[in-house]
Amino acid sequence: MAATQHLLDVDGLSWPELQRRLAVAEQMRAIRLSQAGRVNDLRDQSVAMLFYEASTRTRLSFVEAAHALGAHLIDFDVSSSSVGKGESLADTVRTLGALGATTIVLRHDRAGAPWLAAQAFGGHVLNAGDGWHAHPTQALLDLAVLIRHIAASDGSLAGRRIAILGDLQI
C-alpha cells in the first residue's frame, strides 16, 4: 500500500494540495462522464463504509466512487453490529483492518472521531462528516463546483465573496 494518507479536515491542506486534489477529482469526473466510465485504480483495495449517522448523498457518492474505481466494498451496518453492545470505534476500525479494509470512509456524530479512527487504523481514513465539526469531502465538492461554474470565466476565486446557504446543486 502507498503511504497512508488521511482526509480528516481541509484546514491543514495548502492551496497547492487543494488544487492537486481537485485536479485529480476533475480527471476522475471526466473519465466517469466518458464512454469508459470506470477505472481500476483501486482494484486491489477494500473500502469500508462506516456510517454512524444516516446519510444519503455522501454515502451513495462514496459507494459509487468505490465501484467506479474498482474497489471491493465492505458495507458495514453499524445498527446490526457490536457497536450497539458498546464496541468502541477503535475496536471497530481495527476489526475492519483485520478483515482487509485498506480505506475507511467514516461518518460519525462525534467531532474528532475520524482522528481517533486514524490513530487506530493502519490504512487510510476519509472523514465523511463528524458532527458539526468538519466535512472535508463536502468542502472539496463545494470548492470544485465553485471553480467549475463561477470561476470558469477567469479561472480564479480571488477577491470574490461567496455565501453558501443550504446544499449546492451539482
Task: Describe the function of each predicted region.
Residues 31-39, 122, 150-156:
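Short, glycine- and charge-enriched coil/turn segments that flank and shape catalytic ligand pockets
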Residues 36, 42-147:
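Phosphate/diphosphate ligand-binding glycine-rich loop within oxidoreductases
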Residues 1-64:
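Positively charged, low-complexity intrinsically disordered leader regions
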Residues 52-64, 147-170:
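Glycine-rich phosphate/diphosphate-binding loop of Rossmann-like nucleotide-binding domains
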